[in-house]
Amino acid sequence: SGTAAANYYPAICEANISHVPLVVLTTDRPHELRQVGAPQAMDQLQMYQNHVKLFVEMALPEATEEMLNYAYWQGAKGAAFAQQTPAAPVHLNFPLREPLLPDLERKTKSSQQTALFAGQSILSTEQVQQLADQWYQKNGVLVVGGSHTEEEAALFIQLAEALQWPLLADPLANIVTHGQNSEVVIAHSDLFLNVATLPQEPEVVLRFGSLPISKNIMLWLKRLATTETAFYFVDENGQWQEQLKKSQTVIQAKETTFVEQLLTVVKPTEATWLAQWLLLEKTVSEVLLETLNATELNETTASLAVHQTMKENGQLFVSNSMAIRYLDRFMDSRPYRMFGNRGINGIDGIVSTALGMSAVAPTQQNVLLIGDLALYHDMNGLFLAKRYQLPLTIVLLNNNGGGIFSFLSQRTLREDDFEPLFGTPLDLDFSLVAELYGASYQEVKTIAELKQILQTAAEEPQFQVIEVKGNRQENVHLYESILAEIGRRVERQGISWNG
């Protein structure tokens, strides 16, 4: 209740945008103690506003059959509402009078059960065929955002293969991680889109869900939206969350069912279309292999080491800001599951959410890749690992501040202005943080040392913090040098480079 309930706010906002079905229960003062100056009382009616899809002010409890039925029905209704498309949080607020404890010896009837039958949005066979006909022999691109399971990722890959279209995806879609046997998955498009001029432009863009994290994909699509390219947007949640606002066709259907329908009717386009993408992907992959293998331990190579040491079916939670971008730019295909909070893209609650991931599968390999600011923001979340003995390996990328702003226009400010406003150095000793919460701690100096610790942790899970100290300016220099080398090689292939 009170400010404790207010502390749920960031999680509820994230769950709303990420379409996580969450039931939030808060306690409250009874009505006669509200707005009269009673202690520990605040207005909790609609306290989460439009970030929840349902709010219920529960009745005061009574030990009657009618009230038990009421409580059951509101609980069932709340759980059902949370799961209905679009999935989102619901809030039930419970006012309580003293005595606050019920009669625990009192016998009550067994809880009733309510079965819920719900349909899903499905296109007709004629509608699916009409779309397939519109795409026949067209050069297209699949763009997939959002978070997906391995099975869902496999369906998107099958569709791209059936069409012979390149597939661009957000890292959390788990398409890159599970696309190791498919050439249609373009893992490194962020490093060439919007700067390399493709010999052919797509005639069709088929989008599923939110835009991927890549800014270059977004800018490229934004430019295409001013051309003759036809945009199709699959809107599973029926909310028209289309950032570009340029789609000529909106398809309201359950994504996986729609893809399964398409697989029965679509035909492949000419092989030359995919070939130009494969050439660019091959060029970028070669540059990354040569450059990063010759680079000492830093934030980028540490992120790749985490990626490369993930076991099949392992679980990696990736923080926002730079951690997710390192993987989006540089990772290749590996069969593990990646998680993150990409609804609002904030750094609140990253540690707690990662520990929730670990709690679901504590015997699996569980790793968190996080920066120092994000760890500091949710430091108290580490207590969950100690309290519930959750074996999470935390790889801390510590560049003493907010690294993302060193890649943005703010970096041109004077250091005296940049550091307190955007760099925001913490100067914290994280070995003491680890000690406080009962985690083992190691600072690593080499890639080999980091990989060895991660491989051991994969076989013998434990709660530990592995710190990699980095330098913000070095990260920017490495990124820019990689782009420059990619540009040189691409231009030698006769492709214009505007980087």
Regions found by a protein language model. Give the residues of each.
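Conserved thiamine diphosphate
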Residues: 1-65, 70-72, 76-93, 98, ...
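Structural signature of the thiamine diphosphate
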Residues: 17-19, 53-109, 197-226, 230, ...
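Thiamine diphosphate
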Residues: 25, 32-45, 329-499
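Glycine-rich phosphate/diphosphate-binding loops that line cofactor/substrate pockets in enzymes
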Residues: 79-86, 127-141, 159, 199, ...
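Active-site diphosphate/adenylate-binding microenvironment
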Residues: 278-363
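Glycine-rich, acidic loop regions that bind phosphate or pyrophosphate groups
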Residues: 26-73, 170-280, 467
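Structural motif
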Residues: 140, 204, 315, 365-367
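Glycine-rich, anion-gripping cofactor-binding loops and their flanking helix/strand elements
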Residues: 145-232, 240, 333-363, 377-379, ...
